[in-house]
Curated annotation (Swiss-Prot):
Family from the record: Belongs to the krueppel C2H2-type zinc-finger protein family.
ZnF (C2H2-type) residues: 6-28, 34-56, 62-84, 90-112, 118-140, 146-168, 174-196
The keyword Transcription appears for this protein: yes
Keywords, sorted A to Z: DNA-binding, Metal-binding, Nucleus, Repeat, Transcription, Transcription regulation, Zinc, Zinc-finger
Listed SMART domains: ZnF_C2H2 (SM00355)
Gene Ontology CC: one annotated term: nucleus
Function: May be involved in transcriptional regulation.
Name of this chain's protein: Oocyte zinc finger protein XlCOF26
A GO MF label: DNA-binding transcription factor activity, RNA polymerase II-specific
Lineage, uppermost ranks: Eukaryota, Metazoa, Chordata, Craniata, Vertebrata
SUPFAM superfamilies reported in the protein's UniProt record: beta-beta-alpha zinc fingers
């Protein structure tokens, strides 16, 4: 983390050299010109389109021997395999906590520095991670994303919406393997399982 002095204002990623930052920023603001004919996804670089197209053709994919998930790049497979091995090669020098991704360590480090480069344009609240800002911005949305057709209640999260819908349908998809009792919410199943 120390020594990386060029930071991307869009995602917070840091670089040692200004040239690397400028090259990276093309991904955010570049004119997207290369379109996948299979799925319509658009890319700023032809090389990224070619890599993406391997998903559709199945050519030169790297497959995880543990779970079968496939990747277009070997480095992404190696990063993914840390899920199975439990390897966490990136350690915080401040508190000793370890992470499986460099980007996760970088975001964690902001806890110690107090850095919050992402500001909500609606209310001015600041965040250390862009994803946290995105989640927060959904709370400002005038029109909620998911509306229940039964009662009109609205939700910003799809998972909460589906959970709510089960109150109308009576659906109980979470079943205890010990006794067969079913629950509408996974959390209720977990609480129940502690009784066995």
């Amino acid at each position: 983390i120390v020594g990386k002095s060029y930071s991307c204002t869009d995602c917070g990623r840091s670089f040692y050299a200004k040239g690397h930052l400028l090259n990276h920023q093309k991904n955010h603001g570049g004119e997207k010109r290369f379109t996948c004919t299979e799925c319509g996804k658009i890319f700023t670089r032809k090389s990224n389109l070619r890599k993406h197209q391997r998903i559709h053709t199945g050519d030169n994919l790297f497959t995880c021997t543990e779970c079968g998930k496939r990747f277009t790049e070997k480095r992404n497979l190696l990063i993914h395999q840390r899920i199975h091995t439990g390897e966490k090669p990136f350690t915080c020098t401040e508190c000793g906590k370890s992470f499986n991704l460099w980007s996760t360590l970088r975001n964690h480090h902001k806890i110690h520095t107090g850095e919050k480069p992402f500001t909500c344009p609606e209310c001015g609240k600041k965040f250390s991670v862009k994803n946290s800002l995105r989640k927060h911005q959904r709370t400002h949305a005038r029109k909620k994303l998911f509306t229940c057709t039964e009662c009109g209640k609205t939700f910003t999260k799809k998972s909460t919406f589906h959970m709510h819908q089960s109150t109308h349908t009576g659906e109980k998809p979470f079943t205890c393997t010990e006794c067969g009792k079913s629950f509408a919410k996974n959390g209720n199943l977990r609480i129940h399982q502690m009784t066995h």
